[in-house]
């Protein structure tokens, strides 16, 4: 092997691997376990995926899809590494205000929404076979459901309200044609 060839190999080995630079790992100082992976998925020098880890297991993944510095999507995982729920920021303020839950088969089953953007869920949307079937909502913030919606064929069929605060509907509007 010539000196020139050896020099080229040594210099080449000292160059950073651009693919490796896209993924950064952090380890817990006490346990030595992997605690975070940061990924530059778009290859533009800015991290856009943050994976919070317990060793080799995902706890949560946060994604800044539009790279504005605010997280847009949160994925939460069970200890068995199943996707538990997906959070999104509907107001694009970097705070989750809606969470989607799926069945074991991956079909959307429920969405919980904090309509006041305060982190407190007050609207529950239930899905059957991929379509909205019913909604329950706490409209006055007292922690009790006081509005119920039923949906049929992707259209609202009826809305019921608890205007007397008894915990049961006392007024219903039916939108179905009779």
Give the residues covered by each predicted segment.
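Calcium-binding motifs, dominated by EF-hand helix-loop-helix domains
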Residues: 37-41, 51, 59-65, 75, ...
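Post-signal peptide N-terminal segment of mature Sec-exported envelope proteins
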Residues: 19-43, 50-51, 60
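C-terminal motif of bacterial Sec signal peptides marking the signal peptidase cleavage site
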Residues: 10-12
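Bacterial signal peptide processing site
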Residues: 14-16
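Acidic, glycine-anchored loop motifs typical of Ca2+
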Residues: 43-46, 67-71, 92-95, 117-120, ...
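A short glycine-rich beta-turn/N-cap micro-motif
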Residues: 31-34, 55-59, 80-85, 104-110, ...
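Aromatic-rich beta-strand edge motifs centered on tyrosine
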Residues: 25-29, 50-55, 74-79, 99-104, ...
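Bacterial N-terminal signal peptides that target proteins for export
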Residues: 1-2
